[in-house]
Amino acid sequence: MAKQEQNIVYLYCDGACRGNPGPGGWGVLLRYNQHERQLHGGVANTTNNQMELTAAIEGLKSLKKPCQVVVTTDSQYLRRGITEWLPVWKRRGWRTSNKKPVKNQPLWETLEREVERHTIVWHWVKGHSGHAENEIADELANRGIDEVLKRGAR
């Protein structure tokens, strides 16, 4: 485990999809001081990007009060979307540079509300590159998919 500053929440999030669209899952690993919490869930029909957004939303929603948070994701869509593209999309009336509607707008709006509660630093790591906490978040996301598939098989 990497050295972590005290009184900062470290949030590692990941989304996964089997088929795109298809059954998907999200996973979150939270660390605060000596405490650790794992969250996951799944959806029967979704996309990988929707699950990436949902992971960040659910992780931030789980924090009971405003915090300093370091969010680590392997999704450039999530990191660049929240740090670079969101203000531009809003200025353009939720349109991309091609004048098309922004995909997943309701999720982006929900994420923005959650982000406003906290002081956040966003980090990107390459997926499946051996980053221990990101691998745990990935395992949790896949557990979310497995649970959806198990429910569907009943």
UniProtKB/Swiss-Prot annotation:
PROSITE patterns: RNASE_H_1. Its cofactor is Mg(2+). One of its GO terms (cellular component) is cytoplasm. The keyword Cytoplasm applies. Its EC number is 3.1.26.4. Belongs to the RNase H family. It catalyses: Endonucleolytic cleavage to 5'-phosphomonoester. Binds 1 Mg(2+) ion per subunit. May bind a second metal ion at a regulatory site, or after substrate binding. Monomer. It is found in: Cytoplasm. It comes from the Bacteria. Keywords: Cytoplasm, Endonuclease, Hydrolase, Magnesium, Metal-binding, Nuclease. Mg(2+) 1 binds at D14, E52, D74. This is Ribonuclease H.
